[in-house]
From Swiss-Prot:
One of its GO terms (molecular function) is structural constituent of ribosome. One of its GO terms (biological process) is translation. InterPro entries: Ribosomal_bL19, Ribosomal_bL19_CS, Ribosomal_bL19_sf, Translation_prot_SH3-like_sf. The keyword tRNA processing does not apply. NCBIfam families: rplS_bact. Pfam families: Ribosomal_L19. This protein is located at the 30S-50S ribosomal subunit interface and may play a role in the structure and function of the aminoacyl-tRNA binding site. This is Large ribosomal subunit protein bL19. Keywords: Ribonucleoprotein, Ribosomal protein. GO terms for cellular component: cytosolic large ribosomal subunit.
Length: 115
């Protein structure tokens, strides 16, 4: 049974999206349907969490807009995600960056990864 589920999930996983890690600043292009028309909205922020794996994988992006912290969780394989752009790579030593919620201003920045 487990092999059957894995085989079905493998078919539905999207391969066209850019790979990113925790700490990266990304732009998520999301399709939004309003009435009978569809448009693309861009949500830019820092990836603070990646969860699960395979078809059920999700990630959370955090940004501060007008002094208010906004977090949005997206399923990676959702059809509403048009594309993901990596703005900059971050250098972090944690898998979950929940400590950024308590920080304000420059303290909430993630160091940039230099290669």
């Amino acid at each position: 049974m487990n092999e059957i589920i894995r085989a079905i999930e493998k078919e539905q996983i999207r391969e066209d999206l850019t790979q990113f890690n925790i700490g990266d600043t990304i732009k998520v292009h999301v399709r939004i349907k309003e009435g009978n028309r569809e448009r693309i909205q861009v949500f830019e922020g820092t990836v603070i969490k990646k969860q699960n794996g395979g078809l059920r994988e999700t990630f959370t992006v955090r940004r501060v807009a007008y002094g208010v912290g906004v977090e949005r969780t997206f399923p990676i394989n959702a059809p509403i995600i048009d594309k993901i752009d990596v703005v900059r790579r971050g250098k972090v030593r944690r898998a979950k960056l929940f400590y950024l919620r308590d920080r304000v201003g420059k303290a909430a920045k993630v160091k940039e990864l230099t290669r």
